[in-house]
């Protein structure tokens, strides 16, 4: 559960970091997907489904980390 919370915290920090940026349509869709994963992870945590929560939080974190990386 702690790892899941760390991933969600990291994802939130990544989203705050990219918030001021102008995002293209694809990036905006990715942000929506990230937020959906985060919401689903929180529901899974509340239902005690630790594995599902971790998997969703991990996906959200990976996507948010990709958005934070500078484009080349």
Task: List each language-model region with its residue ranges.
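Amphipathic, heptad-repeat alpha-helical segments
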Residues: 1-32
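Short, charge-rich amphipathic alpha-helical segments embedded
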Residues: 25-37, 45, 51, 55-72
């Amino acid at each position: 559960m702690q790892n899941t919370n760390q991933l969600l915290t990291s994802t939130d920090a990544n989203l705050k970091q990219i918030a001021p940026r102008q995002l293209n349509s694809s990036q905006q869709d990715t942000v929506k997907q990230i937020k959906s994963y985060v919401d689903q992870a929180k529901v899974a945590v509340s239902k005690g489904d630790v594995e599902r929560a971790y998997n969703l939080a991990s996906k959200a974190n990976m996507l948010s980390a990709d958005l934070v990386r500078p484009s080349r």
